[in-house]
Amino acid sequence: MAASRGRSKKRSNLELSPDNLPLRSSGRQAKKKAVEIPDEDEDGSSEKKYRKCEKAGCTAAYPVCFASASERCAKNGYTSRWYHLSCGEHFCNECFDHYYRSHKDGYDKYSAWKRVWTSNGKTEPSPKAFMADQQLPYWVQCTKPECGKWRQLTKEIQLTPHMARTYRCGMKPNTITKPDTPDHCSFPEDLRVLEVSNHWWYPMLIQPPLLKDSVAAPLLSAYYPDCVGMSPSCTSTHRATVTAATTTTGSASPGEMEPSKAAPSSLVLGMNRYFQPFYQPNECGKALCVRPDVMELDELYEFPEYSRDPTMYLALRNLILALWYTNCKEALTPQKCIPHIIVRGLVRIRCVQEVERILYFMTRKGLINTGVLTVAAGQHLLPKHYHNKSVLVVGAGPAGLAAARQLHNFGMKVTVLEAKDRIGGRVWDDKSFKGVVVGRGPQIVNGCINNPVALMCEQLGISMRKLGERCDLIQEGGRITDPTVDKRMDFHFNALLDVVSEWRKDKTLLQDVPLGEKIEEIYRAFVKESGIQFSELEGQVLQFHLSNLEYACGSSLHQVSARSWDHNEFFAQFAGDHTLLTPGYSTIIEKLAEGLDIRLKSPVQSIDYTGDEVQVTTTDGMGHSAQKVLVTVPLAILQRGAIQFNPPLSEKKMKAINSLGAGIIEKIALQFPYRFWDSKVQGADFFGHVPPSASQRGLFAVFYDMDSQQSVLMSVITGEAVASLRTMDDKQVLQQCMGILRELFKEQEIPEPTKYFVTRWSTEPWIQMAYSFVKTFGSGEAYDIIAEEIQGTVFFAGEATNRHFPQTVTGAYLSGVREASKIAAF
């Protein structure tokens, strides 16, 4: 960089200082820098000249040229100029000339490298970059447990992951150690190795470490390699050519290729297609994605030393993520990462030291080593200083079990208290249907890309059934609605919501109104102003779409905030396929719970956090104590005040708890002797029921075909229709559902079901809800307030504490992972 710009074939009277500032020099000044010292002869008859490194702060009193490229190499003697790469690595001016001067033998090699670097990279292909990338020797650590010393390899040896895993002191490629070979482990370690660990060593490094053949390379082919911590000289990091247009627009950031050169993501061979941990250039709005060329805020907070130049951090972080998603079924350890850190020079030692810190941070944050991963007895994912904590987890639903699994894997003592006689909370699968698992609670995964549920399915070898988009709307009477009518009313429905979005832009909390009321107001105004009259069928189809919205909200639209009903859409959401978890969520829940200390039938009555330890008392009078407690009970239980806190929860937190609604959704599942719907539905995964009136819009709006080979349908009761269930028994609900099915398939005989169930979540004493929503005059901020810990002692998790992903098992799970990270940090 500075070397190639500051020196040219024609000598100038200007040279560059170590700080790249021009200095006027002369032959006289140069001679003053040459110091005479006695040679090895004691009589002083001969003298030897040497020159110190001109880099301010460099500790190398007698630099040694590592390159030895020129026949006139200075070795450890005198040279007119030393080029500093690190405090222990320099090359002489003679070796610089050997590669940089066009008439020298090494120029062709440097020139060829420069062309490759320029073609693929973004940084300057300077002589120093060339030396760091091509000429520095590799360093490797002895794998003998009793040794562990670092050794410098000779220049011709290329380090590989296999060599890094198996290296022993004195080992050379393709050779067999003879029995009479001396014990090379007894040889002392190079003194420069110790310096690498010092805090001042890394800031003195001239070239940032750029990994060769990184596992992350196939995932980052659309980026300039040197902007994401990889060497542009490796074929594995060569940028991909454009094969498809990007889906979003915008200018490229410093680490990205220009939009016209950008390429779509390419996956590592064998990696699950739902694993996309890195944003591609110009991509945005994808949940649980990181920018490979930028440090996140929490990373900068944890590693401020990389704020000026994040290259090393990005190189190691990106490598760790790629390794994790390549094999998420085993815990990723520093020992598994180290062989893949292929970089020349002493900086490899520093990278190996740093990868442990970075990996532990990413583990604590739940970025890696998460899901249903279990560790062997006595082994833990975090160092010993994390092990001295005890935690009580209240609730064995997805949030509680996610946190308990993480904390247990970290090495902490964890006890889970569950009120019911089973684990899972709102996850409850019915396995009594022949050949089919039907979830009484959730069973659908909305958006699989980077979804932790998809990760856990991969870990367990569970397949997810992709749901198609086709949903025929069937009217009572048996007619299938014309798709053009459905499309037109779907457009009108979304236009109504767009108007709501415009209306709320300048509205305060006190100006909020119910969403249902606002939609009706906008609809009436549109009809009046446009003069358009919708047909009876079009009005019914609109009611179907409103019913779907009530299903999404978990409540009648007259209870939901028009201002904040979709508050989470302002954050990146999970994209990709919508799938049905055919084995049910219970498979995941059971694996999360494996090996944990779970106390069933232990409803918590009070939590006292006035002392040094938290005292938790269950309804049977049993007392439990721990340093921390994590509360993961449903929102409805907090609203009911079923748990007494001492001191009481703050007014701010209680206001937030009560500003959210405890939504109710009920389900019915029916098994039939045969698939009577096949001829009409024709392979679709679900079909819709067009309600004849607004008063009937929440009754069995959608029927899901639970298995293409079996004869099971599942439907939902939503909105104001949920209240009608309270006055009916299960048989009456069944009869009403069968009446609707017979109307939808009027042209054929509908058999009686051989088995069925009707859920009653509203009457479950320790649940009483499906999922949360924002009530009128509420806001999404309430989710964050509920999630706030108290005095670093009492923590909260659950879907109603996850502002980004509420109402989902995914959101509940991630909230548990989030709190486990916070507990570990306190």
Swiss-Prot record:
What molecular function does GO assign, one term?
Answer: zinc ion binding
Main localization of the protein?
nucleus
Catalyzed reactions per annotation: N(6),N(6)-dimethyl-L-lysyl(4)-[histone H3] + 2 A + 2 H2O = L-lysyl(4)-[histone H3] + 2 formaldehyde + 2 AH2; N(6)-methyl-L-lysyl(4)-[histone H3] + A + H2O = L-lysyl(4)-[histone H3] + formaldehyde + AH2
Tissue expr: Expressed in growing oocytes and in intestinal gland.
**PROSITE patterns given in the database record:** SWIRM, ZF_CW
Gene Ontology BP annotations: epigenetic programing of female pronucleus; genomic imprinting
Q: What InterPro entries does this protein map onto?
A: Amino_oxidase (IPR002937), FAD/NAD-bd_sf (IPR036188), Flavin_monoamine_oxidase (IPR050281), Homeodomain-like_sf (IPR009057), SWIRM (IPR007526), WH-like_DNA-bd_sf (IPR036388), Znf_CW (IPR011124)
Binding positions (Zn(2+) 2): C65, C73, C92, C95
Q: What happens when the gene is disrupted?
A: No effect on mouse development and oogenesis, but embryos derived from oocytes from Kdm1b-deficient females die before mid-gestation.
Q: How is its activity regulated?
A: Inhibited by tranylcypromine, but not by pargyline, deprenyl or rasagiline. Histone H3K4me1 and H3K4me2 demethylase activity is inhibited by DNA, this inhibition is released in complex with GLYR1.
Note down the stretches annotated as region Disordered. Answer: 1-46
Provide this UniProt record's keywords sorted from A to Z. Answer: Chromatin regulator, Chromosome, Developmental protein, FAD, Flavoprotein, Metal-binding, Nucleus, Oxidoreductase, Phosphoprotein, Repressor, Transcription, Transcription regulation, Zinc, Zinc-finger
Residues that bind Zn(2+) 1, according to the entry?
A: C53, C58, H84, H90
Q: Give the start-end ranges of region Histone H3-binding.
A: 444-473, 493-504, 544-578
What are the binding positions for FAD in this chain?
389-445, 604, 799, 807-809
Q: Which cofactor does it need?
A: FAD; Zn(2+)
For this chain's record, the cofactor binding note is: Binds 3 Zn(2+) ions per subunit.
* Miscellaneous notes: Histone H3 acetylation of 'Lys-9' decreases the binding of the substrate, while hyperacetylation of 'Lys-9', 'Lys-14' and 'Lys-18', phosphorylation of 'Thr3' or 'Ser-10', and methylation of 'Arg-2' or 'Arg-8' abolishes its binding. Methylation of 'Lys-9' and 'Arg-17' are the only two epigenetic modifications that have no significant effect on catalysis.
Subunit composition and interactions: Interacts with its cofactor GLYR1 at nucleosomes; this interaction stimulates H3K4me1 and H3K4me2 demethylation. In contrast to KDM1A, does not form a complex with RCOR1/CoREST. Possible accessory component of the polycomb repressive deubiquitinase (PR-DUB) complex, at least composed of BAP1, one of ASXL1, ASXL2 or (probably) ASXL3 and one of MBD5 or MBD6. The PR-DUB core associates with a number of accessory proteins, including FOXK1, FOXK2, KDM1B, HCFC1 and OGT; KDM1B specifically associates with ASXL2 PR-DUB complexes.
Name of the protein: Lysine-specific histone demethylase 1B
Gene name, please?
Kdm1b
